[in-house]
Amino acid sequence: MNPFPFEELHKILELKDTELEIDELLFTSTIFYIEKILGYPLEDHNYNELQTVRDCKVYTNQDNITEMVNIIDMNTKLRVPHCVIDGRTIFLLDTKLEGHILFLNYNAGFLQSTMPADLKEAIIKLFLLKKKEFIKQQNHEDDCSFEIPKDIQNTLDIYRRKTL
C-alpha cells in the first residue's frame, strides 16, 4: 500500500472533484519521478538477499527496514536468533557466523505511519509544480520549463539511496 495515498493528498489540498482523474495521474507521475530520483520505491516491499558476514555484520541492499522476517545461516541452515539492526547494517551477536552466508528476508520501505513529514511535503510541492506545468501546457504558454526547486531537491537528497 502506498505510504502517501492520493486520498490523503486530495484531503490536504482540497482538490476539485472535477479534476480528479488528471490530479491522480499527475500524483502517480510525481511518485514515480520521486522514486526514480531516490533510487528505491517508497512503498513497503519484501526482499530476499544473500549476504556474507564480515566483521560480525551484513548490509541489506534496501533502506528503511520495516520488518526483519527471517535470517537463515546458509552454512548450517539454522535461523539466526539475535541481531541488532541499524539502518542497512545488521550487527550479529554470534561471532561464529563470521564468513558465513546469510539469507535475509525482510520488508523495507515506508508505511503510512513511518512516512517522513518532510518527504510528504516535498511530494506535495512537486505535485503542485507538475500541475502548474500541466496547466501551462494546456494553455499553450511558452514558458513550460520544469526544474526542481532547491528546497525540494535538498529534501530528496536526504532520502536518496546512498551506496556503501
Language-model segments: residues:
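Divalent metal-cofactor coordination and adjacent catalytic microenvironments
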Residues: M1-L164
